[in-house]
């Protein structure tokens, strides 16, 4: 039987999470993409702590963005999560695309975070 898009995404997500592990030296940059918004977190999996977070739901960003579901908004979140991580002394991360394909909004966020100084 053919897999649905949701089942395919869940399988990719499980496969990615099996290979990607965040540590205190190199935490995980996890990205969640919904139809309307995008969310990014820097997570230390050994302590189960979120070290930094950014999303298009935040009031200061929401007012300046035309839409939370385009590549421009994703790039803004990438820059913001990189700035917040660098403030806390985090320069290296492991990228967790969360089962999403590395394309479009996910790619825009990743490239903006790299340009802003995160290493992955």
UniProtKB/Swiss-Prot annotation:
Keyword set for this entry?
Ribonucleoprotein, Ribosomal protein, RNA-binding, rRNA-binding
User: Where do Basic and acidic residues bias regions lie?
Assistant: 1-10
Which InterPro entries does the UniProt record give? Ribosomal_uL18_bac-type (IPR004389), Ribosomal_uL18_bac/euk (IPR005484)
Q: Name one Pfam family in it.
A: Ribosomal_L18p
Q: Name one GO biological process term.
A: translation
- Does the entry feature the keyword Iron, yes or no? no
Region ranges (Disordered): 1-26
| Top-level division of the source organism's lineage | Bacteria
Q: What does this protein do?
A: This is one of the proteins that bind and probably mediate the attachment of the 5S RNA into the large ribosomal subunit, where it forms part of the central protuberance.
Under HAMAP family, the record lists: Ribosomal_uL18_B (MF_01337_B)
Protein family (similarity comment): Belongs to the universal ribosomal protein uL18 family.
Q: What is this protein called?
A: Large ribosomal subunit protein uL18
């Amino acid at each position: 039987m053919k897999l649905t898009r949701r089942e395919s995404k869940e399988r990719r997500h499980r496969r990615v999470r099996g290979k990607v592990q965040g540590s205190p030296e190199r935490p995980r940059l996890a990205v969640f993409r919904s139809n309307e918004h995008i969310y990014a977190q820097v997570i230390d999996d050994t302590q189960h702590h979120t070290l930094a977070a950014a999303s298009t739901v935040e009031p200061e960003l929401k007012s300046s963005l035309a839409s939370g579901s385009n590549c421009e908004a994703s790039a803004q979140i990438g820059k913001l999560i990189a700035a917040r991580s660098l403030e806390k002394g985090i320069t290296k991360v492991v990228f967790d695309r969360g089962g999403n394909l590395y394309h479009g909004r996910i790619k825009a966020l990743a490239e903006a975070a790299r340009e802003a100084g995160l290493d992955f």
